[in-house]
Amino acid sequence: MPAMDEPPVANGPWTRRTRRIAYENPWITVWHDEVTQPDGAPGIYGVVHFANLAVGVLAIDGSDRVLLVGQHRYALDAYSWEIPEGGVPAGESPLDGARRELREETGIEAATWVELGRCHLSNSVSDEEALFYLASDLTEGVATPDGTEALAVRWLPFHEVVAMTMDGRILDALTVIAVQRAALARLSR
């Protein structure tokens, strides 16, 4: 097993024999790969490539309340409470994209930004990478969500949002990770 600080090996024990686009739209490309598996057997692998970097914003006000947005998520056919999040296209910095998403979805602007971390959201089938921020020193404005977003906005105490990520009321991966990282950072103070 490679050491934690060793660079990854290209394709690791997998060998890609062919790659073709199975599906494509402005946001994702689905690749169909013919591969040789680690055990030497032939196989196939589907990979979802995301055009944009995902960003999420954990906005916390002076009363230690977290800003959540609620919306129906088409892929799950379920309603989801989550932090403001969205995609950052090439050419836009992650921080500028996070500022834009917070402003568009909620009308909120933040004076203070701290990067909380990065993660791969579903690395067995996707290359989607996410970056998340803590935003504070907030001022209110007017939201301008895009036509695909029918959003509700709610402020909840930080401790309640932490509980929601623990008991399954919040399942959005980016929200769970950002909230848990912020909670762990508070414990280590």
Predicted segment positions?
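Extreme N-terminal tail/first-helix region
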Residues: 1-24
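Hydrophobic residues on conserved beta-strands that form the core of alpha/beta folds
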Residues: 16, 30, 44-45, 69, ...
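Acidic, metal-coordinating catalytic segment for phosphate/diphosphate chemistry
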Residues: 18-56, 62
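Short glycine/serine/proline-enriched coil/turn segments at secondary-structure junctions
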Residues: 25, 75, 123-125
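Unchanged
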Residues: 43-44, 51-56, 61, 87-174
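A glycine-rich, hydrophobic loop/mini-helix early in the fold
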Residues: 52-78, 82-85
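Generic C-terminal helix-cap and adjacent flexible tail
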Residues: 184-189
